[in-house]
Amino acid sequence: MLTIVWLASAWIYLSSMRILDTQHVPDLRNLSSVTDPERLAEGERLARVYGCADACHGDRMQGQVIYSHPLNGRMVAPNLTQAAQQYTLPELEAIARQGIRPDGTSVFGMPSSSLAAMTDRDLSAVLGFIREQPAQVNVPGENDYGLLTRYRIVTGALPAQAAVQVQQPWRETFRDNEARLGEYLATVACSQCHGMDLEGRPGGAPSLDKMHDYDRFEFVALMERGMAPGERSLGLMTETARKRFAHLTEEEVDALYVYLKTRR
C-alpha cells in the first residue's frame, strides 16, 4: 500500500513539474505609458475593482500569502509594487492578460483568463497606477505547491493560465452600449470567481443566473455592501463586494445589472 501511495505521489509530482516548467511565448503587445492624473486615478479605481489592490495582493499591493497548508502547500500573490518596477510594460501585460511570466512559465491562480479581455486603455491605467506607487519592502516569498495543489494542476482543476486563453482584449467600442458594458465588466471581474461562462464552479461560487431573482435595489445592495436580500451575509462575496465592487460607478452597476438580468 505504501508503495502505491509513493508511486502515485511521484507521478503527480513529476507530471506537475512538466506543466510548471512548460515554456510559453507571449504575443508582444505594446501599451502606452500613463502619467495623466485623471487616468492614474481611474487606474487606482480599476485596480480595486479587478482585485489588484486591497484584495489578492494586499491593501498596498505589497503581496501576501493566499494560503499555507501541509498538503496544499503555499500559494503567494506577489508584491506588485516591486514587480511593476522590475518588469517592462510588455512583460507586465503578458503576465496580466496572457498568464505568462518573463521566464516563459505560466502563472497559476491569477485570473489571467478573465483579465485577458481587459482593454488596452484600462490595463494601461491600472499598470500606470501601480508603477506610480512606492515599492513596498514586503517579501511574501515564492509558491511552494503541495501534493493536493499539484494534483489540481495535473487534473486541470488549477489550470496553467497561459494554456487557457480564450479571448482577446476588447476594443473600446462598447462603452455607449449598456448591456455590452455590463458584459465587459462581468467578463473581466465576475468571471474570476464564477467561471468564464458565469455558470459557477463546483463547490464554489454559484451561477449568476441567480441575479434574475434580484430587483435593482437588491442588486445595488449586493454590489455596494455585499448583502443579499434579507440582509444576509454571503461570506467571500460580501468581502469581495466591499473591497472591490463598491468602487464601481453607478453607470457600471446599472450596466452589470442589465446584462446579468438579460443573459441566458
Model-predicted regions and their roles:
Residues G58-E93, S106-T119, Y145-G156, G195-A221, ...:
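Gly/Gly-Pro-rich "capping" loops immediately C-terminal to redox-active cysteine motifs
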Residues C56-M61, N138, A228-R232:
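Proline-centered turn/helix-capping motifs that create local helix->coil transitions or kinks
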Residues R45-G58, E91-R97, S124-G128, Y184-M196, ...:
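C-type cytochrome heme c attachment motif
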